[in-house]
Amino acid sequence: MIMSKISKLVTHPNLFFRDYFLKKAPLNYGENIKPLPIETSSHSKKNTAHKTPVSSDQPIEDPYPVTFPIDVVYTWVDSDDEKFNEERLKFQNSSTSETLQGKAESTDIARFQSRDELKYSIRSLMKYAPWVNHIYIVTNGQIPKWLDTNNTKVTIIPHSTIIDSQFLPTFNSHVIESSLYKIPGLSEHYIYFNDDVMLARDLSPSYFFTSSGLAKLFITNSRLPNGYKNVKDTPTQWASKNSRELLHAETGFWAEAMFAHTFHPQRKSVHESIEHLWHEQLNVCRQNRFRDISDINMATFLHHHFAILTGQALATRTKCIYFNIRSPQAAQHYKTLLARKGSEYSPHSICLNDHTSSNKNILSNYEAKLQSFLETYYPDVSEAEILLPTKSEVAELVKHKDYLTVYTKLLPIINKQLVNKYNKPYSYLFYYLGLSARFLFEETQQEHYRETAEENLQIFCGLNPKHTLALKYLADVTLTSQPSGQ
């Protein structure tokens, strides 16, 4: 011990005298000063009450707010539009692509059908993400019948605004998605939605982007099959494999990870870089009127992998419920989602997909069940919708026998299909239109009133089969239509 102290004095005199004087006159920190907890390894028996992990695998929460504007972009089509269907069939029948003819899902009408999902998706945005800066709806020129075009938060963007005329008309979502970044006035940060995707709980801007502007991209465990594209692949796999080959040739990275069927945060500058790198290949894709083997999946595959590889995005997870509305299991999914609404078990989003119309095992009344679910989960009318008259407002007019006013007010609403005939909460509109038409027929004996009364009372009674007064009125107008002597 003495030799070690002598050695310390010779080699480190400063430390020797420091320790000597501290022992003679220790520092006094005062009675209120307590020692800090000592971080020890998990094997130490000392100070176990104060063990603190030095590192953690948990991500650090971004302490800074997202302050930049975030837009939302939808793609939408109205399959009930006669002009649209005429053009679709014309180009579909004139297609010479062997791969197109062998892929029913490329042209199947289910891909284009609209059941007002867009209306409910916007309702979900207004309720669960009211911070959204602006909403753009990209269409082939159609306008949703329920949309209030005077609303300043929603803008319709025709295909002709963002796609060169040589590639129009197009019925290929990959073509449309490749040009979304060209929307005039679009913010650098935006979220791409299909019209069948809805939010299911409150989400903040930081769920989609970091405060520094990185996009958060929602990765899954699914993998794009290895190997190059072949005729057995789906059209989505064709487009994703083509995108993978472009990415591999440029970066050496072989992309396999797929992303969730949900919302897709986007960076406009990433799309501009992709256009600059692969303009020629994108234009080959844009020549395809329908999904085809030379497509590129820009919005939900190429953008995502390129953004992550170039440090403009990061991969993360989300909770998304995705199912086919025609599936027999859909009814149970609706019940589960409604039961979990507002709880911690609610998903972040719902994707109500419609697979090919050739599906043989189909849920009975699947359209009515879908409408019932949507109206129950998203009952609050958004500011983007044309306001419908309330039940009490119409009843007051009927009370004063102002049948012509009721008729002229409700007929355009029903004719424009602002209300779906499967939507029971709004069935009163069919009832009062039928009722007013019934009394107008009684007064004037004009056949078109009787036909309107019969048609709308039938719809109402189908949804409300025990409504005795409606059944009586329906019987009256139906009997009147029978030729005398029968």
Curated annotation (Swiss-Prot):
Entry-linked Pfam families: Stealth_CR1, Stealth_CR2, Stealth_CR3
Function: Part of a group II capsule biosynthesis locus. Part of a 3 gene operon, deletion of which prevents synthesis of the bacterial polysaccharide capsule. Capsule is important for the resistance of N.meningitidis serogroup X to killing by normal human serum. In Serogroup X the casule is a polymer of (alpha 1-->4)-linked N-acetylglucosamine 1-phosphate. This protein is probably the capsular polymerase.
Name the record gives this protein: Capsular polysaccharide phosphotransferase XcbA
Family, as annotated: Belongs to the stealth family.
Keyword terms of this UniProt record: Exopolysaccharide synthesis, Transferase
Molecular function in Gene Ontology: transferase activity, transferring phosphorus-containing groups
Additional detail: Stealth proteins are part of a protein family that is conserved from bacteria to higher eukaryotes. Family members were first identified in microbes as proteins that help pathogens to elude the host innate immune system. Microbial stealth proteins are involved in the biosynthesis of exopolysaccharides. Stealth proteins are predicted to function as hexose-1-phosphoryltransferases.
EC code(s) of this entry: 2.7.-.-
Region spans: Disordered: 38-58
BP GO terms, sorted: polysaccharide biosynthetic process
